[in-house]
């Protein structure tokens, strides 16, 4: 139980520090710099740090701390509730940034800046989290610091099946995100948190259900067991393909690339009035008939 308390304190401290950094950067930086870089970097750091600590609980908790799947899934749900409330509009996910680009909601320079911020934030969180584990504040952190040099791959299936799993998770996530984008935050955040928890339960045993290239790169790309190209296929190509399919299914086309709707018939905005014929038009028709 002491190890769980330490992990809960880690989650709380991470979210609190990131919230302070978020508010400070919002107050000190220009609005454009904050929206396109600082907000994304802090959000990615918060997500990556919590994901790394959650991975310790998932891998070591059941046998070292006696944690059951019900507790772990509850923590996943609560963490994503907190992320959804505190991210201040940041996605912390490269596929969401690419979706905004394909939907003509962001320019190319802005998208590249968001992508670089997400990668840097996730990598910084990985380094800081490992430093925290080195303090050995709990038995789980002690075990994790001893095993850090010998991490195992999160890909526990074939590359093709891993691509399908990550692509399917990303597809359902983005389709839900597109459907809920105009709904209230009080409905959108719990719905997405529940979806992420469900996918963590179903797809976690196969790929850990990242559906986030920046997060996967910071957590598992350096681990032995698979090549960098195999990791890229599963955790980058799979999610990007799933995102594109979700946009196509929702929109019928990719607005950035082409305007022709492939799936849905577009109705005309103007309707021809269907009123009664005037007497003059009736006479004209009668003359034509003669």
Curated annotation (Swiss-Prot):
It holds the Pfam family MIP. A motif (NPA 2) lies at residues 212-214. The keyword rRNA processing does not apply. GO terms for cellular component: cytoplasm; membrane. The chain crosses the membrane at residues 1-21, 67-87, 112-138, 158-178, 191-211, 228-248. Restricted to pancreatic acinar cells. It is found in: Membrane. Aquaporins contain two tandem repeats each containing three membrane-spanning domains and a pore-forming loop with the signature motif Asn-Pro-Ala (NPA). Belongs to the MIP/aquaporin (TC 1.A.8) family. AQP11/AQP12 subfamily. This is Aquaporin-12.
């Amino acid at each position: 139980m002491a190890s769980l308390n330490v992990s809960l304190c880690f989650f709380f401290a991470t979210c609190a520090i990131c919230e302070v950094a978020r508010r400070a950067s919002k107050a000190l930086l220009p609005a454009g710099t904050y929206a396109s870089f600082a907000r994304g970097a802090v959000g990615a750091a918060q997500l990556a740090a919590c994901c790394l600590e959650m991975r310790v609980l998932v891998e070591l908790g059941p046998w070292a701390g006696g944690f059951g799947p019900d507790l772990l899934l509850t923590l996943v749900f609560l963490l994503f509730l907190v992320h959804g409330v505190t991210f201040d509009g940041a996605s912390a996910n490269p596929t969401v940034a690419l979706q905004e680009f394909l939907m003509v909601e962001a320019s190319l320079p802005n998208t590249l800046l968001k992508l670089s911020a997400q990668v840097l934030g996730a990598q910084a969180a990985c380094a800081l989290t490992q430093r925290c584990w080195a303090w050995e504040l709990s038995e789980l952190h002690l075990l994790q610091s001893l095993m850090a040099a010998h991490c195992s791959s999160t890909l526990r299936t074939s590359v093709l099946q891993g691509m399908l799993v990550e692509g399917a998770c990303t597809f359902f996530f983005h389709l839900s995100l597109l459907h809920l984008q105009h709904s209230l935050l009080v409905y959108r955040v719990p719905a997405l948190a529940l979806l992420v928890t469900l996918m963590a339960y179903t797809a976690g045993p196969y790929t850990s259900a990242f559906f986030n290239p920046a997060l996967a790169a910071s957590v598992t790309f350096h681990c032995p067991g698979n090549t960098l190209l195999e990791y890229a296929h599963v955790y980058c190509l799979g999610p990007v393909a799933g995102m594109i399919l979700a946009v196509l299914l929702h929109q019928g086309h990719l607005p950035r690339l082409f305007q022709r709707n492939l799936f849905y018939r577009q109705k005309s905005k103007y309707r021809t009035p269907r009123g009664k014929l005037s007497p003059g038009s009736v006479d004209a028709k009668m003359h034509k008939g003669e």
